[in-house]
Amino acid sequence: VFYQAKGRIIVATFASLISRMQQVLETAKRHERKVSFVGLSMTENARIAKELGYLNYDESQVVSTEQALSMPENKVVLLVTGSQGEPTSILGRLANGTNNRFGVKEGDTIVLSSHPIPGNEEPVYRAINRLMERGADVVYEAIMPVHVSGHASQEEIKLLLHLVKPRYLIPIHGEMRMLRQHKRLALEVGMEEEQIALVQNGRIIEFTHGEMTLGERIPGGYVFVDGIGVGDVD
């Protein structure tokens, strides 16, 4: 990507993915490009990561967004949020033409360095289409291997369970098929059925004196309002 790009390179990633920031910084240095962290979350996460020693770079390699926009376009990389097509992110605003600091133009190369999270396909591909309509070349996982999963493999999950030896396990953040497989892995490494709580969102889990019990499920989720009593919309 860096070899082929003739103009600006805009890399969209998660603001919390420090390892990807490091990769971009190192690659940009090899290609004699300066890097700018765009947006508050990206800037703050990079600052904190550097202070804690998780992100390593020379101060001279990083420039402000204002400096980057005034430099030759083949000498800069802009790190932005919005790899999941979020409409209020920097990349989302670039796609919609609503970003007030700079826009997308012919010659820009935009890299979406993460695969769409299940359920996010529509906003991601909508953003890609709109960026291309504005003249950018968009690189994403379907056409080039720019994505590496940030999720642990099954063997890594087993290793973590061996190291931590948790008293209880509550698989979260995934579809039921994923949570159930997580439970199977825990059983394989020696955990007991009663140590694992496989629950749906809204289920109360209580811990009293170190013991886990399951309570009732609180109704939740989306609430749709039809607006019938709100009045006409002009």
PLM regions and their residue ranges:
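Acidic/His-rich, metal-assisted hydrolase cores and their charged scaffolds
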Residues: 1-234
